[in-house]
Every structure is written in structure tokens, then in C-alpha cells.
Amino acid sequence: MALSQLQCLDNNHVNWRTSEGKAEFFYSEEQRLALEALLSQGVDAFHGVVKGENIRDFLSELEMSRVLSRLEPFDPDCCHCRPDGEEGDEGIGEQDGAQSLEYWPDRSDCSIPDLDLGWPEAFAYRGVTRATVYMQPPVDGQPHIKEVVRKMINQAQKVIAVVMDHFTDIDIFRDLLDAGFKRKVSVYVILNETDVKYFLQMCEKAQMHKGHVKNLRIRTVGGSEFYTRFSTKFKGSLGQKFMFVDGDKAICGSYSFTWSASRIDRNLITMLSGQVVETFDRQFQDLYLLSKGVSLKNIPMENEPEPEPVLQTATVPTAVSESIAKKLINPKYSLVKTKSASDTGAEKEKNSSNCNNMATKPKPKPTEQPPQEQKHPALHNMEKANMFDYLPTWVEPDPEPGSDILGYINIIDPTIKNPHLSQMNRIKIWDTSQATAQFLLDKEQELKQTECQKGSETSQEQTSSKVETHEPYSEKEKSGHGYSETTTVKKEEESSENLVHTSKVDQGRMEHSPSKATSLTQVSQQNQSMDLNEAEKSPSQSRGSKASQTSQGKESMPSNSSGVTLGGQTVSNTEESSVASPGPYEDLEKEPVKDTVDELEDTSIKDPPLENFESLLKSQHLIIPSNTEPVTGPPVPKPRTLPVADFINMKNAQNANIGSPSPCLADSIMPSVNGLDTEGTEDTTHSEKAEEDSDEGVQYFSSGSGSLPPSSSSSVSEEYYLTTSVQRRNSEDPVYNGEFFPVQRKMSEGHISRGSFLSPFHFRQTVMDLGQMENGQRRNPGLEQELQMAMADRHPMHGNEMIYSMEPTQGKPVYPFGTNGLSPSYERLQMHRQAKNPGRARGREESTGVLRGYPQIRNPEGLALRHGFWGPSHAANQPSPLTSNPMPAEHPSTPFGIPFSKLAQAKHLKTKMGASNLDSRRRGHGYLGHKDQ
């Protein structure tokens, strides 16, 4: 029914009276009367109504002819069910269902269209609208409109919906068939009812088969219908032309899918994408609901062929450089063989045939030529690697019982399939920790032959002039118990040119470090008297003393210019110049190794007691070998050292009868007393953590270098690790194994640490540090002798009790390391320090956390944290983790035997003197006064 008629049936609609000259003019009752006159009476009646109603002539001759040709009688029962066996018009398919005879129809205007092949989901927003217009003929280099349509069909993946008035282009139709059959794309086509016969003729020419119809739906629809009062009607035609693809693209315009429209007619199309496509989506569903199906059963079709496999084009790899191509091919992969897909498929076929137990002949497979291996041009002339040369070797753990051999490495010739032991090259793997027994025997025989060749002392002097390189291969030092096991060293004679070169290097070293050689020589002279007594009891030590005397007599020689005597042994900066006799090796070879306790008892009975520093120097614990030549001997295990503190505690009882030292300090030199230098600054030292032994209650300390943390089970000697240089530590560093006292110094000042060797005074100080330079001069060696004798006079003490005397005297200050008073030069030092910083004593007296009247140590992490060192009240009030019963003395003193009362008097003297003796030449790095800050 026409729109004007539908509007008249609406009760709420009001036809506003408008003239023909307005844009809103649409419905006209006069035009309806003229049209009915044309359909009932003809053309003359039409013109008579137009003149009588005084309206415009709105129909052309072409339109009059089309309306008259489409006129048909209206039968109200034409839409009902037809009797069985009655067929409808040609071209109308069975898809039209039977109409209902009831009042309420089965179908309504709002029915859902039957899109059985699928339809893309509706999206709330389809994106930004974009439009592109293409012309026919093309302009500005644009592609042809037919090319644009075909490309869009070939790119479709989901659905293609076409609404067309004339569809006779066979090329476009073949593209639709291929999309539906090969790519399984749903294809819907809606055509004009009057032109469907031309479409069916094209289908006969397209050589269709039954597979093309599976994903193809063809339907027809016409225009709106106009009903008259004389039971007649006529229908319009479908003039819409658009194509909807995948729910996101659409093409519309004047272009019809015909040859003439793409070649000779002028048309245009508009490609749309985005949100505007939603209009085409709804319009197609409405047209599909109103359309009728078209049957294609009268079109001759062939059977559906087998689907052709989709040929995937082999991608040619891009050319790579020669260097990369050589890296990609690794010869390791030639040893790996994996099963291909064909091999696994053949195995499955065999298994299935065995299960079925059917004797079926296998189908002959077409012979396929093996694909040629593709090689990079850079790899054509390369040799194939023999992977047997790259096979790894392995260790067979089959050594003989009781031997030092851990196993063998077998090297097998790859050309021999089953090699025997005679055809293998074996490499023995020895245990380095126990493989020195045979080596000692060989070296002992060599040394015996060497001693036999030396007939007299003249021959010995000739051989000693030659440089003999010694390589220590095994050394076990136990300095804590006076026990030392040394093995022989390997000797290699060098040419005379190397002798001259070595002597020059040694002389240069002595020139650059005169202080070090002087200090070591002075210490050795102090220990010569003790070595002579020891030489009478032990023949092995007598040899060492003779060697030391011989080396002292030859200090002028270039070969021995770099050697120094320490504890009866001659030590060189490059190598040890003395040759040990084979005596110790016989004892080491014949006598088995006993327990440590037995060895300690034997050594304590045979050997006389040694001084504390002398034992350390004798063990050469801090001598750093400067040998630069490569080691050719067997690997040397690390020497094992025992704690020094145990040895000192055990020998304290035997050192009580030794005479007190006589101080011989020079008046012109200000010595370093109580950790203070000549400028009034404090020699700050780091204190090591002490671990408490739960069984014995004895403190153990490591003798390792500063680069390693202290440990009770240290097996590291400073012969293998250099001492660390001066380091700085801030006050924020935590202190473990003790109470934390408040920091009494500036936070910005760094703390200087010297070395890491833990001396018997419980702070780090190496033997080499005793000979440091002060004001360009050497420290007085008398101080070293005084400290050594002070160690000898002390009583045996344990734990923290070592800092207090067990038997304090009345009216006399007690010194834990001796009974000597203050040295003459100490008062001059205190007066000099008081003149240096007059305001320092006042700041110390006002400080809290220590005893009033006693100086406060600048380093709270050093000696101040040792319980009972500087504050006996702390040791009395607070429990110490190191000892359970500390016994503070009535008059505590410093470790160097200086009472605190004397230090307090020196402070007052310093304050009285004022700034008269201020030294402006040098400013110390210690605590600054209030004015200096």
C-alpha cells in the first residue's frame, strides 16, 4: 500500500493543507483521483481530471506506460495456501511457507529475517565514518569501479550482502561463487523481481556446480504497491544498489553489476566505513524479510568436485651475511637425529595394520625426489666437521687402592670401534694434598747428592754465589705452639745474567725502603741472644742460626743485599737464600704425624720458651714473598696456622722470670706512647671481633690479613695475602659482640685503620707497622724492646682478665703488661700535647659515658668497646659476653703500662702552658678543639 494510503489509515495523522510549491508537499488527494482515472478509464480521463482539479501534470509518458504495464487485479485470496500439487509461478522457490488462515498471522511486520548462513554481530560503535568516491570513467588516476568491487569481494572473510536491480556481470558473480565455496563466506543476493529472469540466464552461463549453492542465497523483492478502489493494484521496482561486506564496509551508488554500467555508462560508487555502515545493515535485514526466495533447481549443475588444496607459497628466506650464515650452522647438530613426520606416520600405519590383522597391500606411493639441501653461498666450499673430534673426555674413577691417583682421563682414537687399554692414552689425576710423598723422596735424594758434591767451605761459598731459585711446595706453620714443619724447596740454577739483574733489583728495593730493612735488622739483633741458647738444644735450629750468621756476614754481597734476618732465619724479598739441610725431611718421612696435643707437649719440653714477638717473627708470619718467577713445582696447599692468643696465654707463666728492659729512648725523638703520635693526634686502630669458645672460654683470633674477616678456624697466612692499606670507616658502622657506647666524635671524620693483624694487645697492628715513620724519622727501637719485655713480665691471664693485675699493690699504680713507670720522654710528650690543644681537656672533662677525669678514646669502636679496658665500672655493672667474672683493678692503666692518673695530670699541665708551644707547622688529624671547629 502506498505511503499516502497508510497515512490516511492512521487516526492520529492529520494531513496539513499544503501547496505544491512547499517542500513538505507529499500527499495530494487530487493526484490520487487522477491516477485512478488513468488506471480505470485511460490516458484521456487522466488529463481531464488534471484540468478539472487545476493541478500540475505529474506523470510522463514513460511512467504512464510502466504503470499501465504493471497493473494487475487484486485477489484477496491470492496469499492463502494453494491446493496440493499446484505450483506457483516459475522462479518462485519452496522457501515461501504456507500462509495462515487465522486472523492472527504467523508472520508480522517485525519478524526476524531468516539469515540462516550467519550474520556479523551488531556493534554499538563501528568507528569513524570514512567515505571514498570512485567515478566511471575513473578520474585523477583512480582505479576502475569494477576493480574496486572485485577487490572488496576477494577480501571478504565473513559475509557479503548484495542488493542490486540488474545483475548480469559474470565476472563479479564468479567471484561471489569462489568466495562462498573456497573461503566459506556467506553470500546473500537480493534482486529486483522484474529482472530476475536475466540473472537466471547468467547463472546458466557461469558453469555452476552443486557446491556453489551451499553458501549462496538468492531472493527477490519489488517496490511498494498501490491499491485502487476497483480491486486493482500495481507495484514498483527495486532501485537500491549497494553491497555490504563483513559488517564494517559498504559500497553504494549508481553502478549496476552489468557490463554496460562498467564500460559505457557513467556511474559512481561511494565506499563507506565506520558508523554509517549500520544503516546498510538494517536496510538489508528489512529487505531480506520482505523478499521471496528464488529456486535454482532448473539451472543445470555439475557434481561438487573435491576441494582443491590451498597451495601455500614457500617463503624464500632473506639473504644473510656470510658471518651470520657460518654461525647459524653448528656442527653439533649433525650428531642429533630426530624422527620426521613421515617416519612417525609410517610407524602409526604399521601399528594399525598389526592391530587389525588384515593383510592389505599398501598403496603404492608416488616416488618423490628428495628435496635438495639449500646452502648459503658462503658455505658451499666449507669442509664438513668431524664431530668425533669434538666428543668430550671423561674421568674413569678406577685408581688402585692406597694410591694418590684419583682417576684417569681416557683419550680414544675415534677410528677404532672397540679400543683396548693399550690403544688408549691415559692421563693420571693426582691428589694434590697427598701427592707430595714421592716428591719428597726424590728431592731428598737430589739434596743428598748435592751435599756430597760440596766438599769444603770454599765449594759452598762458590755455590752460594749462584742464584738458586727455591719454590716452596709444602709448608705447615703452627706459630701459636712453636711448632713448625718445613719441607725442602726446589732449587734451579740460573745464568749469571739473571744473577746481576736480580741483585740490581734487590738493591733498588733496599734503596726505596730503607726503613723497613733497618727495623727488621734491629729486631733480629735483639733476638740473636735467644737464638744462641736455642741452638744448643735443637740441632735443626743451630743450622738456622749458622745460616743467619753467614747471611749477616754477606750483607755486602749483591745476591744477599735484600735479605734480612728474622728469628734466626734469613729471608729475602725475592726468594729464601738459605738452603735447608735434609735433616727435617728424614724426620718428616720416618716419623708419622701425631696429634696436636702430643706435639705441643714435646715441643714445650725440648725447646726453650720464646718471646711473644720473637715467636711471631720466627714464624715469618708477615713476610710477603716478592717472588715474581713462575712456580714450577707441585701445587702448594695453604699453610695452617693456630691462634696466637693460645700460645701467648700458655707461655705467660714461663716469661715471669725474664729481666725487665732498660729503656734507651732518644731525647730528640718523641715516641709513640699510648697510641698517640708527636702531634697530639691519636693512633686509631680497629678492634677485631672475638668469638667466645664455649668449651674452654679462651678467645681465638685469626692471623689472616685484613682482606679476610677474622675467624677462629682460619687457615690463611699473610704470606699469601697482602696486608691492606689504610682504610676509612665511618662511625655509623655497627659493632658486634659487645655493648654499643655512644659516639663521642664528629660524624664527618673518617676513622683510619692500620692493617689487620691481631696483636696480643687485642687490636690490629702488624709487625711491619711498628717501624712506621714519624716526622720523617724512625721510631725509637727502644720502645719495641720495652714492649717486648713488658710482654715477658706480665702474669698469665685469660679473657678480659688480661687487662687487670691479679695482685694489685698498695699505693702503686698497677700495669697489666709490666711494673715499669712512665718513660722520661712521656712527660715531654704530654706537655707538648697540652700546648697543642689547650681547650681539649675541658671538652673531655665535660663529656659523659666514661669515667670523669680520664681521657676519652676517639674511636668508640676500638679499644673503648673492650669490656674493662677503659671503664671498669662498665665491666662491673654490665655482663660481658667474653668472661663471666671480670676483676677490675683499683688503679686501671693503659695496655702500655701508663696509669690514667698520669694522663689526667698531663692534661692539666697542657692547659696551664696555654698556646705558648703551639706548633703551626703541622695540624693533626685527630680530635679538633672548639676553636678549630
Curated annotation (Swiss-Prot):
InterPro entries for this protein: FAM83 (IPR050944), SACK1 (IPR012461)
Signal peptide: none
Entry keyword annotation includes Translocase: no
Cited CDD domains: PLDc_FAM83G_N (cd09187)
Record's compositionally biased regions (Low complexity): 702-716
Region described as Disordered: spans on this chain: 339-375, 450-716, 870-899, 911-933
A GO MF term: protein kinase binding
A cellular component term, taken from the record's GO annotations: nucleus
UniProt-listed Pfam families: SACK1
Claim: Nucleotide-binding is one of the keywords in the record: no
Location in the cell: Cytoplasm, Cytosol; Nucleus
Polar residues composition bias: residue spans: 452-466, 515-531, 538-580, 651-660, 875-886
Extent of Basic and acidic residues compositional bias: 467-480, 503-514, 590-609
Keywords: Cytoplasm, Nucleus
Gene Ontology biological process terms in this record: signal transduction
Family: Belongs to the FAM83 family.
Function: Substrate for type I BMP receptor kinase involved in regulation of some target genes of the BMP signaling pathway. May also play a role in other signaling pathways.
Binding partners and assembly: Interacts with SMAD1 (via MH2 domain); in a SMAD4-independent manner.
Protein name: Protein FAM83G
Gene behind the chain: fam83g
